[in-house]
């Protein structure tokens, strides 16, 4: 029988299983869902394509989906984020996975294509950044005669276009068939959600989508508290630099930016923030951060971190103006926040995996982390298990919702209801010793809620 996985070394499975066992103790939400739904198997019949960082925490998510009855095939959504022992553990357990840390862009899209290869085709997508959804929809448009990506503007676009052509040649009509049998997608990140809302505006979303990112127990925890721990971890592992006393610039003060600024401040750095949004800028200022123009500090700061989800935030002219040995990294989803492509003709020296020194024309050098991709996953191991449990519990609930109640949804983008958001939070309280104060019936009536919740209206902003 031909093996149905691609991992770096299947012998790493035992190591991965040991770390999985530890992670499970830190992921109470997922373990609670296994206990609640393990017997009823609400995902029986679901064939889920997963495109999300192949980490130890994701391995616990995958095994939860399988425990609830799903068939799963998995690829990583980032070329540097895979933890090879996690991928090996999942492959050894019988779930097809296609992910290697440091895979090429061509391999990235080939592996994603392989994750779709169920015998009867997939019927659900669990996405992070929207690559799996994009792949199917671009391919279906190409099959309809549209010229997709007529002039590729990046290596990434060249790779996806080539993979779509390859699949069309091998399996004519495949993309359209897959698109039409997908019951829905649950999306993990801000970037992927933005893509989904764009599809809705254009009338091109062919199935329902659940925006997991904007569940409170995802965006206000994973994005903020996860980055608060993982950003500095990534910088330290990559550079061994002491951050205390250094000047760090965080570009963007959304949830990820807030966590990143707090991370650097906690390490003793003097943190400055850049922002385009007046509300976020005011928040940063009132949190005690100096809000500046990048151009005014680019020559004096030591560390630059992008968190925006936008493109061309750090441009080539900024990097040429930086001091010698400035550290540049990104914790947004894609690598285009930093104009890495504009550096290709400069002298690169690889220091170690995902750490490069680049010499500028004036002789100054900069340290680029993970080639501008997610440094907390490329240079470290990403967010801790506990905070990822909250995010992934939302993902499992979203997959159950899409599979068991697909007919209740139109081809729009939805957010999980408040009672499920509160359920996710509640499942994590015992692990950290939190005790809730109960409302008596009179108190509940006074503020217009049920004693058991939900406690806030849908429009409440935490």
From Swiss-Prot:
Pathway(s): Amino-acid biosynthesis; L-homocysteine biosynthesis; L-homocysteine from S-adenosyl-L-homocysteine: step 1/1
Catalytic reactions of this protein: S-adenosyl-L-homocysteine + H2O = L-homocysteine + adenosine
Keywords: Cytoplasm, Hydrolase, NAD, One-carbon metabolism
Enzyme Commission code(s) on record: 3.13.2.1
GO CC terms, sorted: cytosol
Gene Ontology MF terms: adenosylhomocysteinase activity
Subcellular location: Cytoplasm
Family named by the database record: Belongs to the adenosylhomocysteinase family.
Purpose of the protein: May play a key role in the regulation of the intracellular concentration of adenosylhomocysteine.
UniProt-recorded name of the protein: Adenosylhomocysteinase
């Amino acid at each position: 029988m031909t093996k149905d996985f691609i991992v770096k070394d299947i012998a790493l499975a035992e190591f991965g299983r040991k770390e999985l066992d530890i992670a499970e103790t830190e992921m109470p939400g997922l373990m609670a869902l296994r206990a609640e739904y393990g017997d009823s198997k609400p995902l029986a019949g679901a064939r889920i394509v997963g495109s999300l960082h192949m980490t130890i925490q994701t391995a616990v998510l995958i095994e939860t989906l399988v425990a609830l009855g799903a068939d799963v095939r998995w690829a990583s959504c980032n070329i540097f984020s895979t933890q090879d022992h996690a991928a090996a553990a999942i492959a050894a357990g019988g779930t097809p996975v296609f992910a290697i840390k440091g895979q090429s862009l061509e391999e990235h899209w080939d592996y994603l294509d392989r994750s779709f290869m169920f015998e009867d085709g997939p019927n659900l997508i669990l996405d992070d950044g929207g690559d799996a959804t994009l792949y199917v929809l671009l391919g279906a448009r190409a099959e309809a005669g549209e010229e997709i990506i007529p002039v590729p503007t990046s290596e990434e676009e060249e790779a996806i276009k080539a993979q779509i052509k390859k699949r069309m040649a091998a399996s004519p009509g495949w993309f359209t068939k897959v698109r039409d049998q997908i019951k829905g997608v649950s999306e993990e990140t801000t970037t992927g959600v933005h893509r989904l809302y764009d599809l809705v505006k254009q009338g091109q979303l062919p199935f329902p989508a659940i925006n997991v990112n904007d569940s409170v127990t995802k965006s206000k925890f994973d994005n903020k508290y996860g980055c608060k721990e993982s950003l500095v971890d990534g910088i330290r592992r990559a550079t061994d630099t002491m951050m205390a006393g250094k000047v760090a610039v965080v570009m963007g003060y959304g949830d990820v930016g807030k966590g990143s600024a707090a991370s650097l401040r906690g390490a003793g750095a003097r943190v400055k923030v850049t922002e385009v949004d007046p509300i976020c800028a005011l928040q940063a200022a009132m949190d005690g951060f100096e809000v500046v123009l990048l151009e005014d500090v680019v020559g004096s700061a030591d560390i630059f971190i992008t968190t925006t989800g936008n493109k061309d935030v750090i441009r080539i002219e900024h990097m040429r103006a930086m001091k010698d040995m400035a550290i540049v990294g990104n914790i947004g989803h894609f690598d285009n926040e930093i104009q890495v492509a504009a550096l290709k003709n400069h002298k690169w020296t690889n220091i170690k995996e995902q750490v490069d020194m680049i010499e500028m024309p004036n002789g100054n050098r900069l340290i680029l982390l993970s080639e501008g991709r997610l440094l907390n996953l490329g240079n470290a191991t990403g967010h801790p298990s506990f905070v990822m449990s909250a995010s992934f519990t939302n993902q499992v609930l979203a997959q159950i919702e899409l599979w068991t109640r697909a007919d209740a949804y139109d081809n729009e983008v939805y957010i999980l209801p408040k009672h499920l958001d509160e359920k996710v939070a509640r499942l994590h309280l015992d692990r950290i010793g939190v005790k809730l104060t109960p409302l008596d019936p009179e108190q509940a009536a006074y503020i217009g809620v049920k004693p058991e919740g939900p406690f806030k209206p849908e429009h409440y902003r935490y």
